[in-house]
Design a protein with these regions (language model features):
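All-alpha prenyltransferase/terpene-synthase fold signal
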Residues: 1-343
Length: 343
């Protein structure tokens, strides 16, 4: 779909599409868990292989996910998206104006304004491709197409609310685990639930199977995000490159953070607060201190939460009447991987 879009919008006529081309690596580097859940779920519920129409419709989840990543990196001012430069930071390098370093009003400089502005436009293009994936899927009943578009809209509303909570957390010195889970379920979890709903809608599944698959997705998402946050803080072995300390420097409010604030002794908590979230002023010593406190007072608890959510996810999976047990095996393996994946 991206190739078709870019072919229809050559750089000679649409110069700003060069940034979309420039970020092609980011567009193709994802794990595609959401797409896998939707397609495998459909095949398991129907006992039939996913045809081209189903496969295309399910790609809306990955297009939408990319849309959120482009915007998330702007809001968090992240210069890297795991092993790649973030879209806005990549785009900023294209700015050749003599005023590149001149301070901006909203953005730090004219260069960063250019990069972020182009990334916002690219995000909107990618968001439109999510809708086009559903609209152009062949062989779908009109009612099914309408329900999928409705699911996308609902994801928009709930996920943006979760992102808003995440931004509000930046000003909170302490958050509770329950507050964190509400945010995570709305932000990360809602798109995974959308993947389960997509599978169920395409397969015309029963309400009980739909509910069980959505429950699987919800618990899977919580475990997935917790593992992501362990990797993003570098408290476990990871293969995500330089961004393994990014969450610490940026002061991300994760479950790790919530538990460390709650369970660390007063002296360790005070040192943690001083060293956490210092942005460009973060030093290797700050990062090392934060990691030590996270390992001593939060890591075991987060791993226990991951295991608990994986048990709940697998229990929900057992309740689904799949017609093809290869789906159960695949989703079980994806779930268990959240306890040990390195990237």
């Amino acid at each position: 779909m991206l190739d078709a879009y870019l072919a229809e919008h050559p750089e000679s006529r649409f110069p700003s599409t060069r940034t979309l081309r420039l970020n092609a690596k980011t567009l193709s580097a994802g794990k595609r868990y959401r797409y896998a859940l939707a397609v495998a779920g459909y095949e398991g519920l129907t006992g039939e292989p996913a045809g081209p129409g189903v496969a295309r419709a399910a790609t809306w989840l990955e297009w939408y996910h990319l849309y959120t990543l482009f915007l998330d990196d702007i809001m968090d001012e992240d210069v890297r998206r795991r092993t790649f430069p973030s879209a806005w930071s990549t785009n900023s390098r294209l700015y050749r104006g003599k005023d590149a370093s001149r301070p901006g009003v909203v953005f730090r400089t004219r260069r960063t304004r250019y990069g972020a502005s182009q990334a916002i436009l690219d995000a909107l293009r990618v968001r439109s491709l999510a809708e086009r994936a559903i609209e152009g899927a062949e062989g779908l009943d009109p009612a099914v197409r309408e329900r999928l578009l409705g699911e996308l809209t609902e994801v928009d509303l709930v996920l943006s609310d979760g992102q808003g909570l995440d931004i509000d957390f930046e000003t909170a010195r302490a958050i509770t685990e329950s507050e964190y889970e509400v945010m995570s379920e709305r932000k990360t979890g809602r798109l995974y639930v959308g993947a389960a709903a997509t599978a169920a809608t395409l397969a015309a599944a029963s309400e009980s199977d739909r509910s069980a698959l959505e429950t699987f997705a919800r618990h899977f998402a919580l475990a997935f995000q917790d593992r992501d946050d362990l990797l993003g803080s570098g408290v476990v072995t990871s293969q995500i490159g330089g961004s393994a300390s990014g969450d610490i420097a940026q002061g991300k409010r994760t479950r790790l953070y919530a538990i460390a604030i709650e369970r660390s002794p007063p002296k360790a908590r005070a040192a943690f607060v001083r060293a956490y979230g210092r942005g460009p002023r973060s030093t290797p010593r700050d990062v090392a201190l934060v990691r030590r406190i996270l390992r001593e007072h939060a890591l075991d608890v987060v791993n226990a939460r991951i295991e608990s959510n994986l048990r709940a996810a697998l229990s929900a999976l057992d309740a689904i009447r799949f017609r093809d047990d290869r789906t159960r095996d695949l989703l079980s393996r994806l779930a268990r991987a959240q306890g040990s994946r390195l990237r």
